[in-house]
């Protein structure tokens, strides 16, 4: 489907969970001849990341209201109005055929600006619980899609766009069948790390001994303290890294993953075809719990919520999974994934632009 001469503006910011799926769709459409620009904020990750992908970015000033003081709340309407006016001026100059909202605060004023100019608004909700911005924008959107069932009652479930190198991994049967030796446990805390996993997993390693080998991604600034915790637990042989640059290689290495359940992590683990032990971040709307639930229901994962998390709970769970069980879970994870999510979102963008 050629997009020669078509223009898209992607609105996404704040976290990798919003930005990476947006980049996947942007690259897919650019390969079809689309021009793509980005709307973001100058102080969040998209400011550095998006230009590295060869995409020009425009900035508006907007931030969240949750947990802010009374002064910020009083000033909010004026700030939102100014952000809307700025976004509108950017879109008037760029003249996109369609805008794609992938979440983050920037989508709010951006979506309203597009709607006020008669530009179709396409939304994608990455999480199992809809964010506040997308809840509002859904009322004016041309098309609403969701990664997991339940965020919106009637929206099409299309999955989360994930990185092509993860999608290209061999299927679980090819990758995991015939593996022997210690079970390879990949611990992923995200870019900030997960303190609870950093504290718990060295003790789990001590309980499980030689039956596991661990690759632990500790997050920024925590590598030394986590290495020390493994050493103090008598388990200095395990690998600790601050970041993992090549997640596809890490997934290919792993037999099982212990991690948080951010939307993109859950979708990548399903696409890779890996069993998981999810420890959702404690958030008042339990967003990460709802992200992980479809994989638990599919028999591909187990959820341990943070109040129930203990060294014994993790150690007993991992010890209870034989290699045969892990392979079955991996196959169920892969079967639950939506590998063509990027294409599905891109097709809806194309459709909205032609309508």
Curated annotation (Swiss-Prot):
Gene name of the encoded protein: murG
UniProt name for this protein: UDP-N-acetylglucosamine--N-acetylmuramyl-(pentapeptide) pyrophosphoryl-undecaprenol N-acetylglucosamine transferase
PANTHER family per the UniProt record, alphabetical: GLYCOSYLTRANSFERASE, UDP-N-ACETYLGLUCOSAMINE--N-ACETYLMURAMYL-(PENTAPEPTIDE) PYROPHOSPHORYL-UNDECAPRENOL N-ACETYLGLUCOSAMINE TRANSFERASE 1
Stored SUPFAM superfamilies: UDP-Glycosyltransferase/glycogen phosphorylase (SSF53756)
Domain of life: Bacteria
Organism per entry: Escherichia coli (strain 55989 / EAEC)
Name of the top EC class for this enzyme: transferase
Family affiliation: Belongs to the glycosyltransferase 28 family. MurG subfamily.
Catalyzed chemical reaction(s): di-trans,octa-cis-undecaprenyl diphospho-N-acetyl-alpha-D-muramoyl-L-alanyl-D-glutamyl-meso-2,6-diaminopimeloyl-D-alanyl-D-alanine + UDP-N-acetyl-alpha-D-glucosamine = di-trans,octa-cis-undecaprenyl diphospho-[N-acetyl-alpha-D-glucosaminyl-(1->4)]-N-acetyl-alpha-D-muramoyl-L-alanyl-D-glutamyl-meso-2,6-diaminopimeloyl-D-alanyl-D-alanine + UDP + H(+)
Bilayer topology: Peripheral membrane protein
Subcellular location: Cell inner membrane
Residues annotated as binding UDP-N-acetyl-alpha-D-glucosamine: 15-17, 127, 163, 191, 244, 263-268, 288
Role description: Cell wall formation. Catalyzes the transfer of a GlcNAc subunit on undecaprenyl-pyrophosphoryl-MurNAc-pentapeptide (lipid intermediate I) to form undecaprenyl-pyrophosphoryl-MurNAc-(pentapeptide)GlcNAc (lipid intermediate II).
Residues spanning the signal sequence: none
Gene Ontology cellular component terms for the protein in this record: plasma membrane
Pathway recorded for this protein: Cell wall biogenesis; peptidoglycan biosynthesis
Keywords attached to this entry: Cell cycle, Cell division, Cell inner membrane, Cell membrane, Cell shape, Cell wall biogenesis/degradation, Glycosyltransferase, Membrane, Peptidoglycan synthesis, Transferase
